[in-house]
């Protein structure tokens, strides 16, 4: 049996039509807003990926430039050492002023790179910068001898100074 009767809309169904149209409009608006947000996210993601790549490149360039500056600062010392070898046939005592000059230039080069010597003889022993390798009679807690110079780069310790530290008063002073 077929139902060929025309569909008659009830007044309630007619009242729902404006609501359906409003909801369709809201759905379209939300779809457009979602698409805009998605596009914004994709642009931000691409920008962030480009930023990460740029930061890696800048870090590599900074490291390369730092090494370049260090090499350039030390080339003068290399030149001085090569000149000193040219005087190898000279008496050893005649080489001392030249070697001293090379040492001074090398120290200046290190200082230009921000490298400084750790305080040595006469300084208070500081375990942050000194490594005690022995003790001798002398003022307690003072560095008496530097076996190997220590260096720091800013706040970073490159190498501790290996030192001999004073152990206290001499025996004859203690008895008096």
UniProtKB/Swiss-Prot annotation:
Keywords: Chaperone, Cytoplasm, Stress response. It holds the Pfam family GrpE. It is found in: Cytoplasm. It comes from the Bacteria. GO terms for biological process: protein folding. GO terms for molecular function: adenyl-nucleotide exchange factor activity; protein homodimerization activity; protein-folding chaperone binding; unfolded protein binding. SUPFAM superfamilies: Coiled-coil domain of nucleotide exchange factor GrpE, Head domain of nucleotide exchange factor GrpE. GO terms for cellular component: cytoplasm. Participates actively in the response to hyperosmotic and heat shock by preventing the aggregation of stress-denatured proteins, in association with DnaK and GrpE. It is the nucleotide exchange factor for DnaK and may function as a thermosensor. Unfolded proteins bind initially to DnaJ; upon interaction with the DnaJ-bound protein, DnaK hydrolyzes its bound ATP, resulting in the formation of a stable complex. GrpE releases ADP from DnaK; ATP binding to DnaK triggers the release of the substrate protein, thus completing the reaction cycle. Belongs to the GrpE family. Homodimer. This is Protein GrpE. It comes from Meiothermus ruber.
């Amino acid at each position: 049996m077929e139902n060929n009767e025309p569909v008659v809309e009830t007044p309630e169904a007619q009242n729902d039509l404006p609501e359906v149209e409003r909801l369709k409009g809201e759905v379209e608006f939300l779809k457009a807003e979602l698409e805009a947000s998605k596009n914004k996210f994709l642009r931000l993601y691409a920008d962030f990926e480009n930023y990460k790549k740029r930061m890696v490149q800048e870090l590599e360039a900074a490291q390369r430039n730092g090494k370049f500056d260090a090499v350039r600062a030390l080339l003068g010392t290399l030149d001085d050492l090569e000149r000193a070898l040219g005087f190898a046939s000279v008496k050893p005592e005649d080489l001392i002023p030249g070697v001293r000059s090379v040492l001074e230039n090398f120290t200046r080069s290190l200082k230009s790179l921000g490298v400084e010597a750790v305080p040595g003889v006469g300084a208070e022993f500081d375990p942050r910068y000194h490594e005690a390798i022995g003790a001798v009679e002398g003022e307690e807690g003072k560095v008496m001898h530097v076996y190997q110079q220590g260096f720091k780069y800013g706040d970073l310790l490159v190498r501790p100074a290996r030192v001999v530290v004073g152990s206290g008063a001499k025996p004859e002073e203690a008895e008096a």
